[in-house]
Structure formats: structure tokens, C-alpha cells
Design a protein with these regions (language model features):
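Histidine-acidic metal/acid-base catalytic patches
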Residues: 1-54, 139, 162, 175-185, ...
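Glycine-rich, aromatic-flanked loop segments that form ligand/cofactor-binding clefts
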Residues: 3, 9-17, 46-68, 77-111, ...
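Active-site-proximal loop/turn and secondary-structure-junction residues that shape catalytic pockets
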Residues: 20-22, 62-66, 105-110, 153-157, ...
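Surface-exposed, active-site-proximal loop segments in enzymatic domains
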Residues: 24-31, 65-84, 110-128, 155-168, ...
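Conserved beta-strand positions in the central sheet of alpha/beta enzyme cores
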Residues: 57-59, 103, 150, 264, ...
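An active-site-proximal structural segment forming one wall of the substrate-binding cleft
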Residues: 90-93, 122-149, 168-188
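Active-site-proximal loop/short-helix segments
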Residues: 106-117, 146-168, 190-207, 211
């Protein structure tokens, strides 16, 4: 069974990753609000969401599905292992529900081994271990038919500039990503149509080695052996907004470079830590979100919209951990529909003879369906 595509421009599929709705909602000031969700139960919740017509796809970190043991780096290949069995149980649920897998990403941030980085760790033994973990993730992604491999910058960053080996650090990162490409080719994995870099300016490190979409594209073209295979999946509005950048500019640049492979989606208060608010939730970002979709339509881009956010900690219900998680999925999808409907209204925007301020006000009025007569009447009262 393959679920029918969403196909409301510019969105082809809506993807709800395991890490979003499974989040137990701990933060630096308090422990988890919700109980940990077993990965098989999470797959069943995704199946329920798909049955409601909310999603068509999902993604995962390797650690979202099965634990990782650095002493058993190929447990996914052992039919007698719990890892092998669990992965196939999850796949059976997703396949039955017709849920596609958009991407597999390797968690190089959760285990304390990688506290000083994964692919850029100054210790060659830890870099080698990170590569082996990434290879395991690629095998798991192959099992699920994932279309992309995501490299999120994770802990590949720094706090102290003078503690970094600047002559070699980007070479180490290139070795890791080139190695991922080589492994895909060596194993003959046909499911992967590409791999992506997900940049972030900071957090969990003080600074990241690839902080923005522009840095990611420059690195791809300047350091990787097969730049055509690699693109970017920006997390918008969050990651670029943390650095006071505008999401419309980000997608415009990436589309112009043919490097916007798919989109991670949520909301953000600019210049804050990574809020990871659900789409359209919070005090700002409505215009930016709507104009981002308007720009993507204007440029003719179409692709997967993947949620990368979590429910508000205050909205979590420990008495109904499954119900509040399902409601979070519904809220994300509802927000997407609202944003796309509002972007539809901008299709009639006429800018002839208007300056920039007039154009912005005209777009806002059009988005809110305010007619000129009503506006003029309120101006006079």
C-alpha cells in the first residue's frame, strides 16, 4: 500500500518524524513531562495519523527506533538481535499504513561519547566510531526505503575558537560525508536519491561549523566529491531565525542554487534559543511563514514538508500522553493548511506602482481579506 500524495503546492508530502511527537518534553530546567514512547507504539500512532489523512511520510534518527551499543556496531545485521527484530516490526506497521520514509538521520548528539563532536571530533577514534554509526543508520534507512540521509550538525561545533584545529576540521567533516556517499555506493543502496545538510547557528554547541544555509551550500560545493548528491534541508522558521535571518530569503537562495531538497518546518521567536514551536504557534512568524510558501510557489518548487518541532511543554497532558501527542500532529497539519490557504490569497497580489511599504501593506490586507473600502472607513473613524 502506498498512500496518496498530498500535492497542494508547494507541498508534495507531509512528513511527521518520530522525534517530534515522541518528545517527552524535558528542558534544561525540568525533567520529562510525558513518558517515553516505545518506537513500535510510535509507529502505530503514525499509522493512526495516516488513517486520519494527516500525513503521508515520516523520518527518524537511528536512536528513535532502536538503541545503539558501540560494542555491537552491526546488530542491525544479526537476525538473532532485538534490534533486527524491532526494526522489522516497525517497518511492518509503516508499510501496512502506506507511510513512506523521507529520511534517516544519524544521532551524533545524544550519546556522551560525542560530546565534543561526531564527524569533527579531534579524536580520530571517535570520528571513526561516528562514521560506523552513520553507516549503521544508512543500512537502517535502506531497510525502510528512506529517500534521503540527513546530516544534522549536532555537536559538530565549538565554544572556544582557539581550541579548534581550523586547518583540518572541515576536512574531517568532508571525510565523514564523502564516506557516507561512498558507503551508499559500495553497498549498492538504490533507495537514496540524495543526502542533506541541516545547518544550525548554535545549540547544543556555542557555535556550529555549518551555521547557515549559505555555509552549507558553500561547504557542499567546496569540499564534497559529489556535490550533486548533497543538498540542504533548512529548519524554518527556527534555525535561520535564531540568527535573525528571514526564511523567504533562505528558500529563495536555496532554490536558486538547486539545493533545497526538502523543508523542515516549525515556528520560532527570532534571536532566541531553538524554540521548536509548532507551525504558526507563538507570538510571531505568521507573515514570514505565509510569504515563504508564496515564494516557493512563485519559484515553482515542490517537495516534502517535514515537521521538525514539538508540542508546547505546557500543553502536554501526563494523564493522556497518547491523546495529546495525536492532537499535536493534528495541530501541525492544521497550521499547514492555514498557511497554504493564506499563501493562496497572495497569488492575486498586484505591485505595479507601489513602493515596498505599500506592497507589504497590500499583501497583509490581501492575506487577511480586508477590502480597501473597509480600510478607508477605519482610517477616517
Amino acid at each position: 500500500m502506498k498512500r496518496k500524495a498530498y500535492n497542494i503546492a508547494p507541498v508534495t508530502l507531509r512528513s511527521m518524524p518520530f522525534w517530534c511527537f515522541s518528545n517527552p518534553l524535558s528542558d534544561p530546567f525540568g525533567g520529562p513531562v510525558l513518558p517515553k514512547l516505545d518506537s513500535l507504539d510510535a509507529a502505530k500512532m503514525l499509522a493512526q495519523a495516516a488513517a486520519e489523512g494527516l500525513i503521508e511520510a515520516t523520518s527518524f534518527h537511528d536512536d528513535d527506533l532502536v538503541p545503539w551499543d558501540p560494542e555491537h556496531l552491526e546488530d542491525d545485521l544479526d537476525p538473532a538481535s532485538e534490534t533486527y527484530k524491532k526494526l522489522r516490526e516497525i517497518k511492518k506497521v509503516l508499510d501496512k499504513a502506506g507511510i513512506q520514509v523521507n529520511a534517516a538521520t544519524c544521532s551524533l548528539h545524544g550519546n556522551r561519547i560525542f560530546r565534543n563532536g561526531g564527524l569533527t571530533n579531534p579524536d580520530p577514534k571517535i570520528r571513526a566510531l561516528a562514521r560506523r554509526k552513520a553507516e549503521r543508520t544508512l543500512r537502517i534507512g535502506n531497510l525502510f526505503g528512506a529517500k534521503y540521509f540527513i546530516y544534522w550538525v549536532a555537536r559538530d561545533g565549538f565554544e572556544v575558537p582557539v581550541a579548534v584545529d581550523w586547518k583540518r576540521v572541515y576536512g574531517w567533516l568532508a571525510d565523514g560525508l564523502n564516506g557516507a556517499y561512498d558507503y551508499i555506493q559500495k553497498m549498492g543502496f538504490k533507495n537514496y536519491v540524495g543526502a542533506t545538510v541541516e545547518p544550525k547557528p548554535n545549540e547544543p554547541r556555542g557555535h556550529m561549523f555549518l551555521p547557515t544555509a549559505g555555509h552549507a551550500v558553500g561547504f557542499i560545493y567546496g569540499h564534497l566529491k559529489h556535490p550533486e548528491f548533497f543538498g540542504v534541508n533548512p529548519e524554518l522558521l527556527q534555525h535561520e531565525g535564531m540568527a535573525l535571518m528571514n526564511s523567504v530569503e533562505t528558500v529563495g537562495y536555496l532554490v536558486s542554487m538547486k539545493k533545497l531538497f526538502f523543508l523542515h518546518f516549525g515556528s520560532q521567536i527570532k534571536a532566541q534559543f531553538d524554540d521548536d514551536f509548532p507551525p504558526l504557534v507563538g507570538p510571531e512568524g505568521l507573515k514570514e511563514t505565509v510569504q515563504m510558501f508564496w515564494a516557493l510557489r512563485q519559484m515553482g518548487w515542490k517537495g516534502v514538508l517535514e515537521y521538525d518541532c514539538h508540542m508546547l511543554r505546557a500543553d502536554a497532558d501526563p494523564a493522556d500522553p497518547l491523546g495529546c501527542r495525536l492532537q499535536f500532529i493534528r495541530d501541525c497539519v492544521r497550521a499547514t493548511a492555514i498557511a497554504l490557504l493564506l499563501a493562496d490569497r497572495l497569488s492575486g497580489l498586484k505591485t505595479n506602482g507601489l513602493n515596498a511599504a505599500e506592497t507589504d501593506l497590500a499583501a497583509t490586507a490581501l492575506m487577511c481579506q480586508l477590502d480597501e473600502k473597509s480600510i478607508q472607513e477605519w482610517m477616517k473613524n
